[in-house]
Amino acid sequence: MQSAMALSFSQTSFTRPNHVLGSSGSVFSTPRSLRFCGLRREAFGFSTSNQLAIRSNRIQFLSRKSFQVSASASSNGNGAPPKSFDYDLIIIGAGVGGHGAALHAVEKGLKTAIIEGDVVGGTCVNRGCVPSKALLAVSGRMRELQNEHHMKSFGLQVSAAGYDRQGVADHANNLATKIRNNLTNSMKAIGVDILTGFGSVLGPQKVKYGKDNIITAKDIIIATGSVPFVPKGIEVDGKTVITSDHALKLESVPEWIAIVGSGYIGLEFSDVYTALGSEVTFIEALDQLMPGFDPEISKLAQRVLINPRKIDYHTGVFASKITPARDGKPVLIELIDAKTKEPKDTLEVDAALIATGRAPFTNGLGLENVNVVTQRGFIPVDERMRVIDGKGTLVPNLYCIGDANGKLMLAHAASAQGISVVEQVSGRDHVLNHLSIPAACFTHPEISMVGLTEPQAKEKGEKEGFKVSVVKTSFKANTKALAENEGEGIAKMIYRPDNGEILGVHIFGLHAADLIHEASNAIALGTRIQDIKLAVHAHPTLSEVLDELFKAAKVESHATTRTGDAKIKLNTNQEDRKGRRRGGDDEKQPSVSKDLKDISTRPSSFFENISVGVLSLLSLIFV
């Protein structure tokens, strides 16, 4: 789900043996470090090479046939895997992750089926990202119309703004319906079989759906997503005590609503409710609001998004019991101290929204048939999304993507994981770098981030022995932001001054959710600051906020560029370019930290090609 924080579970590391067939044919074990529900804390490399070295042995990834795994199969009486298959790939769950995997699978020539027990689109399309953005679009326009000072600064005069609740709700519902139909039609158009019914794993390479339908596939992907997490002691009636599923229907706009949890979900709904006239009270178990964000960004966001609005908050407390409104009585919330568990306060409000994160939807999937034991409900997987059984061994031909594995509970992360799995089953090794996946909170202004927070980066630097630097730029110095009268905001980058590696970027300001992708792509490609600061940005645009950010970074003079030369040669001849493609300069490149593995790329050439392409296009237009 795009706007859902992972549950606040402590991060736990597990080391499991991974049995792999070596080049000599012998089976050897190599430790595999696994982490569950570690939002933004997993750093996996991105490998496109045809060979992967493990210890002194080499595993060949030249084709699907040469990539073999020794794994324990189920012995629960389900028998051996079938010799022939109905499909190349079966996907259980037709959310954003399953949809992305299905489209990529057909592109790779795989006969594909997708099973859905509810409606196509999953949480994101029907009860998450899509309808919430529709509501936030309304809240953004309401805020602008209600801000008399802001409108006068443009020379505009606007009468009092109002809204029709049902009309707003219809806008969100209609958008969800449209996107759901688009997803369904896109799969039908390319020949994906959409099977209706609850799907479960019956055994190795075997799936059951509906009452008694059994089908087989070479590979199976579990993509069942998540549901709202409701702590014990909270009674949800769907009317006065609600989850995000209910809130998105906007059946009412209460005068006073308590929001339990101040992560992505809670923060976005506070934006909607306050714009529509509600008073909001946050209840947060930790000592500060917005605990999942970079601390500096959290403080600024609180100053802009919380303090000036009709919002108060209680931090360091649990809602131990919430009783819905009934018999003319309001919603009753009992608060206790998060540390001592002593009673703290009692609140009486019109409604309460439970925004305490999401829990994996993995019950009833038949995981016991392949000896898989969940971890807090999450299905354990390795860095290639391969499912791991209770003995720490890979389950053959079984993968899990998205919220169900807990690696990064975002819709686009699920889609990326699905595409990564399809690459693997098609014969090309692919490991997704989760630190390059951006996240965004669509408040007004927006918040976005990619990579590590400042505390996380400094902790990593201390452990691995490198220095961490921080640089910031302000939206108040950006021409486009000032033209929009939206100068409130900053961009912040955490990086290594010794080699120019970008460790994290955080943005708070106008269209932050759109701006973050330049930084996320830089991290994904391993682009160094000394390279990307030479890129040209159109003026005047908001993208110049990042342009100034990159230029403000101080990289040590001895740090080399990605091509191994501190002086970028823009006028390189064809032979020089061929030499670089052959990898002649690769040996000179500085090593990237082990959490962000290098891939062969030349950012300077990329920007040169883009510039040449743009100039060529312009010449065609104006000649």
From Swiss-Prot:
What does the UniProt cofactor note say?
Answer: Binds 1 FAD per subunit.
Matching entries from Pfam families are given as:
Pyr_redox_2, Pyr_redox_dim
- Alphabetical keyword list: Chloroplast, Disulfide bond, FAD, Flavoprotein, NAD, Oxidoreductase, Plastid, Redox-active center, Transit peptide
Q: Does this UniProt record's set of keywords contain Transferase?
A: no
Q: Which residues bind NAD(+)?
A: 261-268, 284, 357
Q: Which GO terms describe its biological process?
A: pyruvate decarboxylation to acetyl-CoA; response to arsenic-containing substance
Transit peptide range is 1-70
Residues of the active site: 539
Instruction: Spell out the reaction equation it catalyses.
Output: N(6)-[(R)-dihydrolipoyl]-L-lysyl-[protein] + NAD(+) = N(6)-[(R)-lipoyl]-L-lysyl-[protein] + NADH + H(+)
Catalytic class of the enzyme: oxidoreductase
Its EC number is 1.8.1.4
* Coiled-coil regions, chain positions: none
What's the protein name?
Dihydrolipoyl dehydrogenase 1, chloroplastic
Q: Which organism is it from?
A: Arabidopsis thaliana
Task: Supply the source organism's classification.
Answer: Eukaryota, Viridiplantae, Streptophyta, Embryophyta, Tracheophyta
